[in-house]
Swiss-Prot record:
Family (UniProt): Belongs to the GDAP2 family.
Start and end residues of each CRAL-TRIO domain: 371-528
Highest taxon of source: Eukaryota
Protein name, UniProt field: Protein GDAP2 homolog
Domain Macro: 56-235
Any Gene Ontology biological process: response to starvation
Organism in which the protein naturally occurs: Drosophila melanogaster (Fruit fly)
Gene null: resulting phenotype: Shortened lifespan, impaired locomotor behavior, and increased sensitivity to deleterious effects of stressors such as reactive oxygen species and nutrient deprivation. Locomotor anomalies include righting defects, reduced and uncoordinated walking behavior, and compromised flight.
Lineage: Eukaryota, Metazoa, Ecdysozoa, Arthropoda, Hexapoda
SMART domains in alphabetical order: A1pp, SEC14
Gene, per the UniProt record: Gdap2
Amino acid sequence: MRLDTNSNVDFKAFESSSSSCPVKLDNLATWGGSQKTDTRLPITDYSNLGGPRHNRSPFPLCKDVNNRFVIWDGDMTTLEVDAITNTSDETLTESNSISERIFAVAGNQLREELSTTVKECRTGDVRITRGYNLPAKYVLHTVAPAYREKFKTAAENTLHCCYRNVLCKAKELNLHTIALCNISAHQKSFPADVAAHIALRTIRRYLDKCTLQVVILCVGSSERGTYEVLAPLYFPRDQLEERSALWQLPKDIGGEFGEPQHPDPDRQIRIIRNPQHSVHMRHHLADDDSDVSPHDMEGNSSDLEYGARDMNGLSLNSYSSGLQAQLQRDLDRQHLLSDRPRTGVYENVISEGVEGIEHQERYERLLRRAQVEDLTEVSGIGCLYQSGVDRLGRPVIVFCGKWFPAQNIDLEKALLYLIKLLDPIVKGDYVISYFHTLTSTNNYPSLHWLREVYSVLPYKYKKNLKAFYIVHPTFWTKMMTWWFTTFMAPAIKAKVHSLPGVEHLYSAITKDQLEIPAYITEYDMATNGLHYFNPVPTAS
């Protein structure tokens, strides 16, 4: 299955004249249009063979999608599009064939912006810069994961995040044409076919949902064959290709956004058969000042297994160290002693360990979803945001209750946005200012949902929260706060402070660091007047 590229200018011709001869989208053959001049051999009809892997087409024929997708073997830096992509390392200084070409055409201004402004990009994330001398307006930078067979689940998930985050950023910026490079191309250990399936599947799901975007997948001559063979599985151009895909598509066809859906055994706790260690109690788990909690095992196997954080630092040592290694030994011990009586203390160690792992895995799944899903319907409300720092330099999170439409919003997406905003902040101390000003019953979520949110958030959220200010509380607010912190969240009860006015907040947060809507200050002046409180800096 060969894509006709006669209408595409040769790569070497562009290499010498990229700045003077930009390639317009109209000069490229779309995937749907390539069928007219395609010289493929007849496709094998699998209908007479055994049963297909799928009963119905997961990726049905769609001419509109095919006409917004291009596979192109050419120099990406010559494309006159809204954005192109660059794949690099976390310092954004890696030298590979893709980045070198982009830097050569864009000029030194791009390097300067990366070194002075952007500085770094985590694996799976995306950073944006201007295109400078490139025909493209912007460059979207991302970092592909390293591939290890032991951690293939994490690598595949993170590569999906790379593609998904780049595409979502393009949509967020209202970019209509984007050129994607083969993001995993410089990771030689990443299986080419696996990477191609992830890329094509993610692009197809994106184009299904975003009907105004055009995606150009730029591949090298050595990669083109793989993508042209696999593309009909996700972008069928006729009924025969669609029917053949039922047999040829892998069982894992991804989730709603193309994310890998791994079988259950990959997500289960690994039990070794010959454990050599005994059970040791970890007394610091009960210490509230510790950075480690049964519900907060950052940097251990959960990160490694699911790719939510740095994938370049994977090592067997980090995987088997710390709390996770201790819990693993406990579980191994349980496996061997399953038929023997156990003490209550030992059972508690096991149950807490399993519960902690499951809790962390759940949070990591939500975090991955928060990083890839479109949350503009929540972020656009403006009810939750970061506003400067307090007098001790801690980030201040502002929540405006009046602007939170609890009865008319997808509360699951609200939770995802909360996680997306707070996850990079809660690694250190932080404070929250909740403004109850002029709220109504339509702004009150159920206590069940609040309890669910509190239980989902890891230990670091509670430990590093140093103050929770409630401004303009009502009698109802005070009663519900007392009940919630007494029976559901006693760990934060001493950190909650009810303040009758905004000026009381200035004791902890200077006025220039607090950005709040005008309706709050207007209500405060109408209720309390002016200069009703002389703030004295505190170290709350």
